[in-house]
Swiss-Prot record:
Annotated InterPro entries: KOW, Rib_uL2_dom2, Ribosomal_uL24, Ribosomal_uL24_CS, Ribosomal_uL24_KOW, Translation_prot_SH3-like_sf
Record organism: Cupriavidus necator (strain ATCC 17699 / DSM 428 / KCTC 22496 / NCIMB 10442 / H16 / Stanier 337)
Entries under Pfam families matching the protein: KOW, ribosomal_L24
Its job: One of two assembly initiator proteins, it binds directly to the 5'-end of the 23S rRNA, where it nucleates assembly of the 50S subunit.
Family named by the database record: Belongs to the universal ribosomal protein uL24 family.
Gene Ontology biological process terms in this record: translation
Name the record gives this protein: Large ribosomal subunit protein uL24
UniProt cross-references to SUPFAM superfamilies, sorted A to Z: Translation proteins SH3-like domain
Record keywords, A-Z: Ribonucleoprotein, Ribosomal protein, RNA-binding, rRNA-binding
Upper taxonomic lineage: Bacteria, Pseudomonadati, Pseudomonadota, Betaproteobacteria, Burkholderiales
Gene encoding the protein: rplX
A Gene Ontology cellular-component term: ribosome
Subunit structure: Part of the 50S ribosomal subunit.
Database matches in PANTHER family: MITOCHONDRIAL RIBOSOMAL PROTEIN L24
Length: 102
């Protein structure tokens, strides 16, 4: 069970984007792509078959999953634990003890 999933609200803990918040767009193994965070400029070639124009494109680059943390109700970063409730494993915030919506 992944502790961070697509759609979670996270905050960046380290790096050039430290303190920024965003929503997880994708989980790629041990990396996560966070909307509006860690944006790089990539040069794209024009493709007349697809009708795309070339130029410089902003692209979201993935961050290591250990460099982000879930945001609790108080807006603070929180680690995530796993508990068993009613025979199912649920994610629980360590700071508040609240269950994270699946």
């Amino acid at each position: 069970m992944n502790k961070i999933r697509k759609g979670d609200e996270v905050i960046v803990l380290t790096g050039k984007d430290k303190g920024k918040r965003g929503t997880v767009q994708a989980v790629l193994g041990d990396k996560v792509a966070v909307q509006g965070v860690n944006i790089a400029k990539k040069h794209a070639r024009p493709n007349p078959m697809l009708g795309t124009t070339g130029g410089v494109v902003d692209k979201v680059m993935p961050l290591h999953i250990s460099n982000v943390a879930l945001v609790d109700a108080n807006g603070k970063p929180s680690r995530v634990g796993i508990k068993v409730e009613d025979g199912k494993r649920v994610r629980v915030l360590k700071t508040t003890g609240a269950v994270v919506a699946a």
